[in-house]
Amino acid sequence: MSNVFTHINADGNAHMVDVTEKAVTEREARAEAFIEMASTTLEMIMSGSHHKGDVFATARIAGIQAAKKTSDLIPLCHPLMLTKVEVELEAQPEHNRVRITSLCKLSGKTGVEMEALTAASVAALTIYDMCKAVQKDMVISQVRLLEKRGGKSGHFKAE
C-alpha cells in the first residue's frame, strides 16, 4: 500500500493525475454494496408486486449508467472507455437485505475501482429511491472494493 495521496500535488492542492506515460494494461475491479430493509419491503421486490415495476432491473441499469458517468460525478476521475460493466443483485431474505455486486473492465492507463464502486452505490440508491414510499429507514452499507487487477499496484483482494 502506498503512503502518498496521488491526487494531491506538492503544494497540497487537488489535481488530476497525469496518466500520459502509463502503460495500457487490462484492468478490472469488483465492488459490493448492501441495502437493508424490512422483510415486507424485500418480499414486495422479490415477488414483483412493487408498484413501480421491476426494482432489480431498474437498479441494474442505473448501476451500469452510473459506472459510465463516474468521471462526471467524482471530480478527479478520468473519463474511461469501459469495455464491460456488470451489476448483479441478490436478495438475501435471511438478512433482510439485497447484495449488489459490480464488475468493471477496460484496457487502459488507469484503474476502474471508482467505476465499480459508483455502480454498486448507485444501484443501491436506486433501490432506495424506488422503495422509499414503502419504507424510509432502509440502510445502505458496506460499500467496498472487493478486488482489483491490473496496473502498477497489481492485484488487490479484500479479506
UniProtKB/Swiss-Prot annotation:
Q: Which GO terms describe its molecular function?
A: cyclic pyranopterin monophosphate synthase activity; GTP 3',8'-cyclase activity
| Cross-referenced Gene3D superfamilies | Molybdopterin cofactor biosynthesis C (MoaC) domain
Instruction: List keywords of the entry alphabetically.
Output: Lyase, Molybdenum cofactor biosynthesis
Q: Name the residues that bind substrate.
A: L76, C77, H78, M114, E115
Q: What is its EC number?
A: 4.6.1.17
The UniProt entry annotates the active site at D129
Biological process annotations from GO: Mo-molybdopterin cofactor biosynthetic process
Which domain of life does the protein's organism represent? Answer: Bacteria
Q: Name one Pfam family in it.
A: MoaC
Q: Could you tell me which InterPro entries the record lists for this protein?
A: MoaC, MoaC_bact/euk, MoaC_sf, MoCo_biosynth_MoaA/MoaC, Mopterin_CF_biosynth-C_dom
What reaction is this protein's catalytic activity?
Answer: (8S)-3',8-cyclo-7,8-dihydroguanosine 5'-triphosphate = cyclic pyranopterin phosphate + diphosphate
Broad class of enzyme this protein falls into: lyase
Listed pathway(s):
Cofactor biosynthesis; molybdopterin biosynthesis
User: Which HAMAP family does its entry note?
Assistant: MoaC_B
Quaternary structure annotation from Swiss-Prot or TrEMBL? Homohexamer; trimer of dimers.
The entry's family comment says: Belongs to the MoaC family.
What role does this protein play?
Answer: Catalyzes the conversion of (8S)-3',8-cyclo-7,8-dihydroguanosine 5'-triphosphate to cyclic pyranopterin monophosphate (cPMP).
Annotated protein name in UniProt: Cyclic pyranopterin monophosphate synthase
What is the primary gene name for this protein? Answer: moaC
